[in-house]
């Protein structure tokens, strides 16, 4: 789902093979050496319609986008995810190299949805293009408030910039936090089956589930900003 499920594509990618990489690059996207790109709008519908892609896109890959309500994830979807992830990594690496070449900077700041692609960020970090990489965590519209505030502070109020080598952001966990009683009530209202475990037993069961190849969701503390 657009603007909410992109992280699932990154998570699904390791289970597939990038067999559609060339098809994507030959038909859907023109990538320049500096990382800039142009999408072939013949395959997309978001600029003029209510869907992201069109029938020509479906015919290119031989399938329509998956209906999450009644269609299971198949190897095809895993391979599509792996292919898109690889193309995304290529673009981000080219962007990073061209920025370094043009501006000769030691540090890189990233923001936005794609900036939360930690696999691609890891590739940039591993290549040592920059000494340090900092990612602003609020990737959606909420993050724009930070830029608006800083623009007003520096451009309108002529506030003097203070350059610091340290990360002054003390954390992104600025959202609500739920108590044990609130969590229990919510689970009861939903009719969910649940156990309340002591810390040691909880950790042991979590490790056991992970060793058995199960997926574990961990809910704790405050929600992240953005």
Language-model region placement:
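Short acidic/glycine-rich loops and adjacent helix/strand connectors
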Residues: 1-226
């Amino acid at each position: 789902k657009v603007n909410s499920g992109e992280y699932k594509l990154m998570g699904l990618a390791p289970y597939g093979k990038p067999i559609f990489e060339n098809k994507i690059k030959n038909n859907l996207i023109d990538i320049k050496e500096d990382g800039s790109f142009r999408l072939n709008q013949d395959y997309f519908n978001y600029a003029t319609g209510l869907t992201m892609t069109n029938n020509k896109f479906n015919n290119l890959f031989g399938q329509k986008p998956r209906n999450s309500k009644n269609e299971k994830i198949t190897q095809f979807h895993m391979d599509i995810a792996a292919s898109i992830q690889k193309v995304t990594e290529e673009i981000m690496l080219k962007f990073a190299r061209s920025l370094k070449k043009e501006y000769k900077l030691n540090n890189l700041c990233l923001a936005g949805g794609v900036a939360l692609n930690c696999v691609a960020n890891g590739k940039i970090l591993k290549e040592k293009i920059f000494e340090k990489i900092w990612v602003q965590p609020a990737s959606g519209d909420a993050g724009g408030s930070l830029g608006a505030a800083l623009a007003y502070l520096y451009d309108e109020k002529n506030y003097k910039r203070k350059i610091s080598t340290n990360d002054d952001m003390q954390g992104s966990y600025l959202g609500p936090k739920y108590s044990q009683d609130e969590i229990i009530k919510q689970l009861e209202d939903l009719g969910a089956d649940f156990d309340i475990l002591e810390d040691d037993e909880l950790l042991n069961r979590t490790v056991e589930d992970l060793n058995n190849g199960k997926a574990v969701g961990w809910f704790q503390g405050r929600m992240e900003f953005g």
